[in-house]
Amino acid sequence: MGYRILETEDVAGYLRERGHWGTDEPEVREVSDGNMNRVFLVTATDGTRGLAVKQALPWVRVAGPSWPMSPERADAEARAYEQVAKVAPDKIPAIHGYDSDNHALVTEDMSDLEVLRTILNEGGTYGPDTSRRIGEFVAQLSFATSDFGMASAERKALIAASVSPELCKITEDVVLSEPYLEHEHNHWHPGLAAFRSDPRLRTEVAELRHLFMTGAQALLHGDLHTGSIMVGTRDGAPVVRVFDPEFSFVGPIGFDLGLYWANTLVSAARADALGVEGDHGGQLRLSWDAFRAEFRRLWPTRVDTFFDDAFLDRFLDRVWTESLGFAGAEIVRRIIGFAHLTDLTTLPDPVPASRRALLLGRELIVRRAELTSPQDVEALLC
């Protein structure tokens, strides 16, 4: 049977066909919220079990058929989950199966958890574990799939299998070029003309764009923001789950860190605009410290000991600097370009906070080599 787009009424039968559900009739509801795909939650009527079904459409969901997109992008997500399950299974949802014909992924139901962005927008906090676990997640995945953690032949095969030209092109355009050009995806007004014509900024973004296109360091999540993280508690213990790695490919490690940092900094701008006391400002530091500590913990297991400890110090310094640049680019994109953040758009007056965040994004891009510590970045927030 060829590819078919699932509707709500099809899902229960589909799960039975795939051996994921019994004869009882579940409750099925569509909960699609992201830009790209359809998502269904399937729950037993007595509440004893549940599954989630995510299907890639042949177009971008929020745009419809006018923006076609191969549903094979779901293959990259399935491969990413397979890799993460080897090194950080506690930080992703349980995967029950992937159907490559229909580009549909069946996972655990995480409706007992909440999307991190939603919690933050409603005035909540990150808590003590979230950013630490995100830093560990990036370190564990990136070390294991880098030249330090994976044999050369295996890594070359991973690079080839993880090539994702359509989705990488989206990032190259939407994050790393369109915000600095006249483009239909942008939200420009006359006050931004000087920003767009800034030659230094454009050159620095071009450097980041080239790094994104050529820096095949490790397997990335590729879209690591506060909307792709769910948090909560289970059995009294904190839970952090990273999901939606469909933009996964082998690229520069700093891109994943940078996307997360951008979102934490924008959430800090929201909290400041609302006068909310919270733990927003220290999240970059917490995630970086955890990333660096976990990468160093894994370092003695590297497959090539020619890379010595002094090299590791230099390597981590480069990752830090590149992460800042990508963070700045993501902040700029989320304000000027495609897919704005509700962190800012739901403010009573989003303009002042957006303007401050935009200037912060520029500083992170053009001054990334000067900002050598989390404290330097935190000073920019004052």
Kindly label every feature range from the protein language model.
Residues 102-114:
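Conserved short submotifs of the Hanks-type protein kinase catalytic core
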Residues 254-303, 327-344:
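Active-site activation/catalytic loop segments of kinase-like enzymes and analogous catalytic loops
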